[in-house]
UniProtKB/Swiss-Prot annotation:
Sites carrying sugar chains: N33, N46, N64, N152, N181, N243, N248, N286
Encoding gene, per UniProt annotation: CRK4
EC number: 2.7.11.-
Locations listed in the record: Membrane
Extracellular domain ranges by topology: 17-287
Family affiliation: Belongs to the protein kinase superfamily. Ser/Thr protein kinase family. CRK subfamily.
Organism field: Arabidopsis thaliana (Mouse-ear cress)
Protein name in the entry: Cysteine-rich receptor-like protein kinase 4
Listed CDD domains: Gnk2-like, STKc_IRAK
Sample GO molecular function, one term: protein serine kinase activity
């Protein structure tokens, strides 16, 4: 009989003995999971690497190590035998528990991963990690682990299940923002319901804010939120939710700001399956949980309905009011994210003028900073707006369901007295129109950045149309509604006009025409017909504006005569074989001809007169990312302006109203029109 299988165990014992003078006897800590990703990258017992590893682990588990922050890094040896390691303790545990957990994990490391150069060990109270590579200040997704309760949520009502997932997802994502903006990169949150929901998120403190947030968001997406509890580990971050307090609430009380309490009033409870048995070794511990789902905030919805009814009696308008759709019940999705007005008022310094970021069609936008350091954009709807209450409800309903890097994220809302406020993530670089239409700012966006922005907008619209759980038509895509993040990443904003489509719905009609002049498709402006192809038309206009730095609403000259608006002007350049004359002079000497030409071609396909001729957003994304895809020949665009002032102006002359009444010119977002 071979005794080869005993070698790792004997090595583990001898290694543990060599560290025993450095560590006092410790309690047992339950091993949740481990990762030894490579069987190729190994070392031998007599190697320099093993000597360096012992030095590293002795340093990390030493009583002289600093456990006050719950995080420590160390390096031992020189390349190519250098070892880098770290430990991360859960943010609420004491120094003593942290020290003991690290010492315990050091003793166990060779039991779980003998001879491996790259190792991650996960325990409930701590994580130990080391590698032959530099792992400091770097996000790592290899070596992940997921632990889920074995029982699904038991409910015959799918809406209740979805509402539970929305509650957990939205609260975890809000906690992720708080953690990313804190120095400790740790945050807990307790949602007050009849049976409380507890959440915890944490990153290694050496990560940047952006890396921490991205890591946590990825971990949240990695969990199946149909279970009644679970957790997800990456070497760089972790997230967890339960219905019982699994962390030290006293130690974390300061991390949960009293200014952001959930305001939902649950009306029903969800029946849950009984929890399974807990496995202690190797398989991880399942969560024994019973979770309550917050169901619609009936009072809040009734408040909206009552308010709409009163205004309908008081105010007569020249258009037919559309009833709120069935999706209005979903405003409760964001119920757990309702903000307290006093907290928002304090964050914006009582809506101080110096904090004002801008003004939109329905109100003003302010920058706010909460005591935790989180920066937000606060959209305060005007109290005198005759239309804002509808858009407020619509925006909460729509945006609360969306999570995509190319969409501005809704953090919460406030509805107190006559105040209607939306709280968004803060996007520092203003909107796209601030750059492309300003002669002094245009040079900051070279072609590489503009091409990236075009791709980001396309992916964001594709998510709305196809990849999200809902099919959403934005209806107000324009340069002013594209915000730019830290890395000039495009984020679509302002969902006040958006409409949700049913599963098999492809188009809809409305007598309430809303939008911005120059971006609206012909069939929408004339007949109130809108579909995904309406957004495609707007996207095409946006692409032409990004390439040219010109507004579509202006009239341009060609050969000494009027060439019409930007769409018509581009079509004439294309027909004459000189489309590159459209390029913004600020980057004319530094761009890829094939990329610009292809983008102009795609834009002309998007603004074709007939909706069925326009490509879908999925096709557009493929066209942008795959140069080998052949492009169709574009047909004449909608709203085509002829060169002679005596000739008809295409579709525009069929409208029974003047274009000045059709809609505003770029700086406002709403118009009411009654077509024939």
């Amino acid at each position: 009989m071979s005794f080869f299988w005993l070698f790792p165990f004997l090595l583990h014992l001898s290694f543990a003995d060599s560290l025993s003078p450095l560590s006092a006897p410790v309690q047992n800590f339950i091993h949740l999971n481990h990762s030894c990703p490579s069987s190729i990258l190994t070392y031998s017992r007599n190697s320099t690497y093993f000597t360096n590893l012992k030095t590293l682990l002795s340093s990390l588990s030493s009583r002289n190590a600093s456990y006050s922050t719950g995080f420590q890094t160390a390096t031992a040896g020189q390349a190519p035998d250098r070892v880098t390691g770290l430990f991360l303790c859960r943010g609420d545990v004491s120094q003593e528990v942290c020290r003991n957990c690290v010492a315990f994990s050091v003793k166990e490391t060779l039991y779980w991963c003998p001879y491996n150069k790259e190792v991650v060990l996960y325990y409930d109270e701590c994580m130990l990690r080391y590698s032959h590579r530099n792992i400091l200040s770097t996000v790592t997704y290899d070596g992940s682990a997921i632990l889920l309760n074995g029982a699904n949520i038991s409910s015959s009502n799918q809406n209740q299940v979805d509402e539970f997932r929305d509650l957990v997802s939205s609260t975890l994502n809000l906690a992720a923002v708080e953690a990313a903006n804190s120095s400790k990169k740790f945050y807990t949150r307790k949602v007050i319901t009849p049976q409380p929901l507890y959440l915890l998120v944490q990153c290694t403190p050496d990560l940047t804010r952006q890396d921490c947030l991205r890591c946590l968001q990825k971990s949240i997406k990695g969990m199946s939120l149909y279970r009644i509890g679970g957790r997800f580990f990456y070497p760089s971050c972790n997230s967890r939710y339960e219905n019982y307090s699994f962390y030290n609430e006293t130690a974390t009380r300061s991390s949960s700001p009293p200014s952001l309490p959930p305001r939902s009033t649950p009306q029903q409870q969800l029946k849950l399956a009984p929890p399974p048995l807990i496995s202690e070794r190797g398989k991880g511990r399942n969560s024994s949980v019973i979770i309550v789902v917050v169901v619609p905030i009936i009072a809040l919805l009734l408040l909206f309905v009552a308010f709409f009814s009163l205004r309908a009696k008081k105010t007569r308008t020249n258009y037919e009011r559309e009833p709120l759709t069935e999706e209005s019940d979903d405003i409760t999705t964001a119920g757990s994210l309702q903000f307290d007005f006093k907290a928002i008022e304090a964050a914006t310094n009582k809506f101080c003028e110096t904090n004002k970021l801008g003004q939109g069609g329905f109100g003003e936008v302010y920058k706010g900073i909460f005591p935790s350091g989180v920066q937000v954009a606060v959209k305060r709807l005007s109290k005198t707006s005759g239309q804002g209450e509808r858009e407020f409800a619509n925006e909460v309903i729509v945006v609360a369901k969306l999570q995509h890097r190319n969409l501005v994220r809704l953090l919460g809302f406030c509805l107190e007295r006559d105040e209607r406020i939306l709280v968004y993530e803060f996007v520092p670089n203003k909107s796209l129109d601030y750059f492309i239409f300003d002669s002094t700012m245009q040079s900051l966006l070279d072609w590489t950045r503009r091409y990236k922005i075009i791709g980001g907008i396309a992916r964001g619209i594709l998510y709305l149309h196809q990849d999200s759980r809902l099919t959403i038509i934005h209806r107000d895509l324009k340069a002013g509604n594209i915000l730019l993040g830290d890395d000039m990443n495009a984020k679509i904003a302002d969902f006040g006009m958006a409409r949700i489509f049913g599963m098999d719905q492809t188009e809809a009609n409305t007598r309430r025409i809303v939008g911005t002049y120059g971006y609206m498709s012909p069939e929408y402006a004339m007949y109130g017909q809108f579909s995904m192809k309406s957004d495609v038309y707007s996207f095409g206009v946006l692409v032409l504006e990004i390439i040219s730095g010109k507004k579509n609403s202006n009239v341009y000259q060609m050969d000494g005569t009027s060439a019409g608006n930007l769409v018509t002007y581009t079509w004439r350049l294309w027909s004459n074989g000189s489309p590159l004359e459209l390029v913004d002079p600020s980057f004319r000497d530094n761009y890829r001809i094939n990329e610009v030409s292809r983008c102009i071609h795609i834009a002309l396909l998007c603004v074709q007169e007939e909706a069925e001729d326009r490509p879908t957003m999925s096709a557009i994304v493929q066209m942008l990312t795959t140069s080998s895809i052949a492009l169709a020949v574009p047909q004449r665009p909608g709203f085509f302006f002829r060169s002679s002032k005596h000739e008809q102006v295409g579709l525009v002359d069929r409208l029974s109203i003047n274009t000045s009444a059709l809609c505003s010119v770029d700086d406002a977002s709403i118009t009411n029109v009654t077509p024939r």
